């Protein structure tokens, strides 16, 4: 590992709000072990975090700047506190919201702990006594399991036949796929068994082509499902919400692009993915332990977690 990373100088980690205090010290310990520099923070490797520390804390963890849960890291925290080694550079213009209007201004004040009377009225105007379970409403949930439950409920309301696509899984001898409570495979985001219908809302969970905007988080609606000569699902046709998404992809797949031109459909096929296999102790396995998964990188999207929606 040290030879592989011999030229490593800097690690950039995005979404700092998802990094717990314990994970910060795990990163420190791992780099010290790899580079055999036990007395130098992060083994002498530069670390740059990017993100928003005013977002909600990591799942089952503390904010990165707080004392870690694990007692083995507390000594290090009390002695030198890794977070104190960082220098903050604050970006002051919110490009995602743009000028944004009063709603964006309201959200920006709330994130700073400032709530005006008008802000409160704005939020309360969106309050409802009964849960909304129509196909146009997005629900925010705390866990992925709750998300999967709500997505399944909403999918059942979509008219038309249910189609299932099971992932093709190739694993080393003696290894089995790790399927999470919400039906996703490993840490890849894709479903072991993807259930869908024409007309269902979906979101991409893998970066297929960043130039073509076919990226993790791209949302749309299924407008068609195409099969091969063996009646196996070949691709899913998606009309994406963002104009221009998948234009290059359509040119590379003219067969279905022309057929679904009237709905701006983009064909999405199975992607080849490689999960990071780990030992029982949680360590990454080395050469000879490669696994491959082939699955359509979409999931039903009527709900998502609080953490997912804020990034």
Indicate where each model-derived feature is located.
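Conserved ATP-binding/catalytic motifs of P-loop helicase motor domains
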Residues: 1-310
């Amino acid at each position: 590992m040290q030879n592989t990373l011999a030229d490593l100088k800097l690690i950039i980690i995005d979404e700092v709000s998802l990094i717990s205090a314990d994970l910060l010290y795990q990163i420190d310990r791992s780099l010290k072990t790899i580079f055999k520099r036990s007395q130098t923070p992060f083994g002498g490797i530069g670390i740059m975090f990017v993100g928003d520390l005013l977002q909600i804390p990591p799942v089952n963890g503390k904010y990165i700047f707080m004392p870690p849960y694990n007692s083995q890291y507390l000594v290090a925290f009390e002695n030198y506190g890794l977070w104190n080694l960082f220098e903050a550079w604050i970006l002051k213009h919110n490009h995602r919201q743009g000028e944004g209007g009063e709603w964006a201004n309201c959200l920006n004040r709330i994130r700073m702990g400032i709530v005006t009377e008008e802000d409160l009225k704005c939020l309360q105007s969106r309050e409802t006594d009964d849960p909304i379970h129509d196909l146009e409403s997005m629900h925010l949930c705390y866990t992925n399991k709750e998300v999967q439950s709500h997505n399944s409920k909403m999918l059942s309301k979509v008219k038309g036949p249910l189609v299932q696509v099971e992932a093709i899984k190739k694993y080393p001898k003696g290894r089995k796929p790790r399927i999470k409570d919400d039906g996703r495979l490993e840490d890849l985001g894709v479903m072991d068994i993807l259930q869908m219908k024409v007309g269902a809302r979906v979101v991409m969970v893998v970066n297929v082509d960043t130039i073509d905007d076919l990226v993790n988080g791209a949302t749309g609606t299924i407008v068609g499902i195409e099969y091969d000569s063996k009646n196996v699902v070949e691709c899913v046709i998606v009309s994406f919400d963002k104009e221009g998404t998948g234009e290059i992809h359509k040119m590379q797949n003219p067969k279905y692009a022309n057929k679904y031109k009237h709905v701006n459909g983009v064909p999405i096929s199975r992607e080849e993915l490689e999960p990071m296999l780990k030992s029982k102790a949680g360590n990454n396995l080395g050469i000879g332990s490669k696994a491959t998964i082939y699955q359509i990188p979409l999931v039903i999207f009527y709900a998502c977690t609080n953490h997912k929606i804020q990034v």
